[in-house]
Amino acid sequence: MRIIKPSFEIWDQEEGLEGIYKQIERAGRVCYKSEDKITEDSAKEFVERMIKSGHGAMLEHGTVYLKIPYGTMDDRGEFSNEPIVIKYIDNPYSVVMNNSENDYWYITSNYRVIIENEWIDDLQYLCEPTEFHAKRITVHFVCDRGVSHKKFVA
């Protein structure tokens, strides 16, 4: 029998799309016990395999921060980029904030939302998190298997 000392580690996501890929790969490799296969350029290929095989749960670990300008206002008083934002407002796994002082919407979501809804074009608005984004973190917990299967009630 091996005694496991409980611990945790906060995983910061690196910048850009490559950072999203690396975060997803790291979580997936821990899950599949293949951390030794991580290389400097293995992340994108790993993510593509997860998508192809339908293992979307790993994609949730890749945080996507978008910064979308309001755009131009039409004669009905609606902004040109509003349809892009509304789909995230309607998505339960995304958080939309706005700042009327600088005319931007700030969206926090995850890569699974982007892939499963075929919103890949929205990555043109990819940015680093700002003070206006809802912040997401990934925490790696090490604990006894029995503890990991318990339901905790606050």
Regions found by a protein language model. Give the residues of each.
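A conserved ligand/cofactor-binding region detector
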Residues: M1-A154
